[in-house]
Amino acid sequence: MSEKKGRKEEVITREYTINLHRRLHKCTFKKKAPKAIKEIRKFAEKAMGTKDVRVDVKLNKQIWSKGIRGPPRRIRVRVARKRNDDEDAKEEFFSLVTVAEIPAEGLSGLGTKVIEEED
């Protein structure tokens, strides 16, 4: 029998479009941007299967760019599952969420895209 690597054990990067409008519906105005960050963390945790999710500063700035009440309706993010080099870490992997470049045509029609690592 050949040994197969598990789905959760490989280092991988994917691009997703997250519909924040759907996730923030019926949310109080003054809680929208913090809830958007929490929803992005929840999405990345589910997509990559890691408990340790780190949000990039640029992504945080983009969510908060129009204030606490006006996060973007949709956002294109790049989620990377990386190996944790820290010896005393609880998890073997962590997820890093960054902002992906939005094409000129807009977000419609974009699906999930696997990004090849350039090492």
UniProtKB/Swiss-Prot annotation:
SMART domains: Ribosomal_L31e. GO terms for molecular function: mRNA binding; structural constituent of ribosome. This is Large ribosomal subunit protein eL31x. CDD domains: Ribosomal_L31e. One of its GO terms (cellular component) is cytosolic ribosome. It comes from Arabidopsis thaliana (Mouse-ear cress). Belongs to the eukaryotic ribosomal protein eL31 family. GO terms for biological process: translation. Keywords: Ribonucleoprotein, Ribosomal protein.
